[in-house]
Amino acid sequence: MASQVVLSFALVVVLAVFVGQVDSCPSDCKCDYRSSQCRPANDDVHPNVCIDHYCVVMNLAKREQRPELSPGAWDDSSEEKDNEASLA
């Protein structure tokens, strides 16, 4: 019996990792992934419905690694961001 509980829990964990996110928000709320807090899904939902609810997000996407700069090399990433901001 105990082994079935452990296996069930392990299956839930594996499925959560496979899906990439565990969302524990009420049905009228959605997960704000930056703050891991639940927010109203639309304007018809009262904010108190979602308060005190949190969601856990596991981001499995790999970020592209930036190459290491040699000492004294110019890092122009902030300049690129400034150019993109001025174009927007």
Curated annotation (Swiss-Prot):
An example GO CC term for this entry is: extracellular region
GO MF terms here are:
toxin activity
Looking at the UniProt entry, the stretches that span the membrane are none
The keyword Disulfide bond belongs to this UniProt entry's keyword annotation: yes
Positions of region (Disordered): 66-88
Which controlled-vocabulary keywords does the entry list? Cleavage on pair of basic residues, Disulfide bond, Secreted, Signal, Toxin
Q: Which residues form the propeptide?
A: 79-88
Signal sequence segment: 1-24
Q: In which tissues is it expressed?
A: Expressed by the venom gland.
Q: What domain of life does the UniProt record list for this protein's source? A: Eukaryota
UniProt subcellular location? Secreted
Q: How is it modified after translation?
A: Contains 3 disulfide bonds.
- Which pairs of Cys residues are joined through disulfide bonds in the record? none
* Protein family membership: Belongs to the scoloptoxin-XY family.
Name of the featured protein: U-scoloptoxin(XY)-Er1a
Q: Which organism does this record belong to?
A: Ethmostigmus rubripes (Giant centipede)
Taxonomic path: Eukaryota, Metazoa, Ecdysozoa, Arthropoda, Myriapoda
